[in-house]
């Protein structure tokens, strides 16, 4: 059988993967701090006794676009935005430490601070705040709680956000959307990052997603047309093989 059917099939498979990545990016176009996922492909020439006229395609090392998103001023005390290489530490489902740029902090029914359901990690572990307290976050990540009835100038720190610094090449996104240290980074910096006291946050501000929704929609349309073309190639190769078999049977 002509190798073209295999090359077209491989290309169609990778096109579906590209569509899945683009769909995920579109779904997170309004997620604070989201970093668009990249999908890179590379050509792999087919080696063998036949002429080198066919080339397969395979996925290359995936990654994320670390371009900062635009800043949205929300005036909400629990919304924070970080510097370019700054990350918030959170606790993942398996108890390990992960990192996110999403600064939309919520308070769960038990008083624990969370981001997308993940407990926010402070310098002394997960952070909890008193029920009904007015929460403020300072530029250095210190969280203070003002209980009802307390004087307005009362400062009662309840914890401090663990702010860490890492470049895009040092972290990898997990299936839950939380970034973790790559194996290479763990070998040089340890299993978790240490808090960086030089980092600062802006309270009442959220960094938006860096997904370009218009470009992502264009990519979806282009991927759909590319997939359709690849299916036509497979169909044409199959038809040609059928006609060749008919000619051989006639002879």
UniProtKB/Swiss-Prot annotation:
UniProt keyword Oxidoreductase present: no
Superkingdom of the source species: Bacteria
InterPro entries: Flag_bb_rod_N, Flagellar_basal_body_rod_CS, Flagellar_FlgE/F/G, Flg_bb/hook_C_dom, FlgE/F/G-like, LlgE_F_G-like_D1
Family: Belongs to the flagella basal body rod proteins family.
Annotated NCBIfam families: FlgEFG_subfam (TIGR03506), PRK12640.1 (NF009280)
Subunit and interaction comment: The basal body constitutes a major portion of the flagellar organelle and consists of five rings (E,L,P,S, and M) mounted on a central rod. The rod consists of about 26 subunits of FlgG in the distal portion, and FlgB, FlgC and FlgF are thought to build up the proximal portion of the rod with about 6 subunits each.
The protein, known as: Flagellar basal-body rod protein FlgF
Organism from which the protein derives: Escherichia coli (strain K12)
Gene this protein is translated from: flgF
């Amino acid at each position: 059988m002509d190798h073209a059917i295999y090359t077209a099939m491989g290309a169609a498979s990778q096109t579906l993967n590209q569509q899945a990545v683009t769909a995920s990016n579109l779904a997170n176009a309004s997620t604070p701090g989201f970093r668009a996922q990249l999908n890179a492909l590379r050509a792999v020439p087919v080696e063998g006794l036949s002429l080198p006229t066919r080339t397969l395609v395979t996925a290359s090392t995936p990654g994320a676009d670390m371009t900062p998103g635009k800043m949205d001023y929300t005036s909400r005390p629990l919304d924070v935005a970080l510097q370019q290489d700054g990350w918030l530490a959170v606790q993942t489902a398996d108890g390990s430490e992960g990192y996110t740029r999403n600064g939309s902090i919520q308070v769960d029914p038990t008083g624990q601070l969370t981001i997308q359901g993940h407990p926010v990690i402070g310098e002394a572990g997960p952070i909890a705040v008193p029920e009904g307290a007015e929460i403020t976050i300072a530029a250095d990540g210190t969280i203070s709680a003002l209980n009802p009835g307390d004087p307005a100038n009362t400062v009662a720190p309840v914890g401090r956000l663990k702010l860490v610094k890492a470049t895009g090449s040092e972290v990898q996104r997990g299936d839950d959307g939380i970034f973790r240290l790559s194996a290479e980074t763990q070998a040089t910096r340890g299993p978790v990052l240490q808090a960086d006291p030089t980092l600062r946050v802006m309270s009442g501000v959220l960094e938006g997603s860096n997904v370009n929704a218009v470009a992502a929609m264009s990519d979806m349309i282009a991927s759909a047309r590319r997939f359709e073309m690849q299916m036509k190639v497979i169909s044409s190769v199959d038809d040609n093989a059928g006609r060749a078999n008919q000619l051989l049977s006639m002879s």
